[in-house]
Amino acid sequence: MQHETKMENQSWLKKLARRLGPGHVVNLCFIVVLLFSTLLTWREVVVLEDAYISSQRNHLENVANALDKHLQYNVDKLIFLRNGMREALVAPLDFTSLRDAVTEFEQHRDEHAWKIELNRRRTLPVNGVSDALVSEGNLLSRENESLDNEITAALEVGYLLRLAHNSSSMVEQAMYVSRAGFYVSTQPTLFTRNVPTRYYGYVTQPWFIGHSQRENRHRAVRWFTSQPEHASNTEPQVTVSVPVDSNNYWYGVLGMSIPVRTMQQFLRNAIDKNLDGEYQLYDSKLRFLTSSNPDHPTGNIFDPRELALLAQAMEHDTRGGIRMDSRYVSWERLDHFDGVLVRVHTLSEGVRGDFGSISIALTLLWALFTTMLLISWYVIRRMVSNMYVLQSSLQWQAWHDTLTRLYNRGALFEKARPLAKLCQTHQHPFSVIQVDLDHFKAINDRFGHQAGDRVLSHAAGLISSSLRAQDVAGRVGGEEFCVILPGASLTEAAEVAERIRLKLNEKEMLIAKSTTIRISASLGVSSSEETGDYDFEQLQSLADRRLYLAKQAGRNRVFASDNA
């Protein structure tokens, strides 16, 4: 059993060796080299991509930090003003001017519009509306015991607002809007008749309504974006606001309005002029606010599908990046603004940059290496193929008879020995047939050697067509052939020999114009069944002796024993 397994393994290895010829080995080697070179290039591309993404995030982070610091400064001022307002509500200053302001408020509170002004150079005026107008608002109320303190606190905050407001700040307007029907603003109201309109414009804004105790339970700083109406000449603004509370009572809202154009200008100033890419600012609902591109402020606006992808990515982290077609979009949420800063870097900008140059060089190197590898593969593959064809041709010529295309004597003996050994191992019969054409010399002498060659080729074809798939035939001399039949008994071999004899004798062949001949053969058969001997040379010798017995008996017959 072990011997059978070993023979099967050897047969399998030989089949594999035949299939994996030199050409396949060359192909495999070049495929491995190409695969590893591509993997190395891909790894370099991955490292380069990581460096590119880190670079994009660093550039974005620098601008985001600069914008955040500026916005933080304004938020800190707003918190400072709220703290000052709370202190003034609890412990107002005991100044005569402030007491006079309270008295003046009591005198004018029923008027449709009124203004209380102490000193124009030091503080801001308090503008207000009547009790009747206040009573019409759902969120408005003057029914609080600290109304007088709120008036004086508003005047004190007006002093701080004047000091805090300057032209270099991003803030265009800072204001305190009270639920009690008055406001203080760094933007003056030129005519008193415009006070009601302006006040109701304040208290109907989201940045005021959004600070009710139901809307803003944590009483935190909030950001709001106001988009202008189509018929309005006003520009979009971002408002940061904070509620003013004391003793669990909501007095009003402190706010600062920042025009979007000033944020756009700040973005342009904060960007390195040598860097490509567009920076865009969005609010918390991903509504576009402004862009750093002065020529095309809406050049890279995202469509709804892209905005949905961006919003989905932002749900999981405060910063990140995503590829959209030929653009790489990096984003980072701001700490002191309820929004997100986005950087859009297009493919053309990336190609012009340092990473683009490195990528192009890397691609060209890979393409050059691959081209050289393919050329080398083609040359070597062609050379190996030609050598393999030449080797196969030489091997075939060394193993075969070129006239009959059967195995020659040496090849037949090489084939016969392992087959005989295999049959002996498996205890299968092993038979041999010797074939000799009758009167072949006469054909040569009468019709010439070319006719003799045709007869040999014709006979070889008929012999081959009479054999089984596992049988082997060869030409062992002049007009003499030998057939090896592994696994065939003496009787089966005799039947094959008879089939060969009949085929040879039945068919006439054309030798020359209008000349046909019919050939015959004498055949001798031997088998290992007779003596238990698997020696091929002995079996061939026995079959050869029986062949001559057939010739002596009159030719054109089969002898499978010495007595037949």
Curated annotation (Swiss-Prot):
Phenotype of null mutants: Deletion of the gene increases swimming motility and early biofilm formation. Disruption partially suppresses the reduced motility of a pdeH disruption; concomitant disruption of dosC, dgcE, dgcQ and dgcN completely restores motility, suggesting these 4 genes, together with the c-di-GMP phosphodiesterase PdeH, form a network that regulates cell motility by altering levels of c-di-GMP.
UniProt entry tagged with the keyword Secreted: no
Site (Transition state stabilizer): K441
Catalytic residues, chain numbering: E479 (proton acceptor)
Catalytic activity: 2 GTP = 3',3'-c-di-GMP + 2 diphosphate
GO molecular function: diguanylate cyclase activity; GTP binding; metal ion binding
Listed Gene3D superfamilies: 3.30.70.270
SMART domains xrefs: GGDEF (SM00267)
EC number: 2.7.7.65
Transmembrane segments: 20-40, 360-380
Sequence ranges assigned to domain GGDEF in this UniProt record: 428-563
Induction of expression: Constitutively expressed at both 28 and 37 degrees Celsius. Induced by 0.3 M NaCl. Expression is RpoS dependent.
Top-level division of the source organism's lineage: Bacteria
Record: residues binding Mg(2+): D436, E479
InterPro entries reported in the protein's UniProt record: CHASE7, Diguanylate_Cyclase, GGDEF_dom, Nucleotide_cyclase, Rev_trsase/Diguanyl_cyclase
Protein purpose: Catalyzes the synthesis of cyclic-di-GMP (c-di-GMP) via the condensation of 2 GTP molecules. Cyclic-di-GMP is a second messenger which controls cell surface-associated traits in bacteria. Involved in the regulation of cellulose production.
Protein name stated in the entry: Probable diguanylate cyclase DgcQ
Gene source species: Escherichia coli (strain K12)
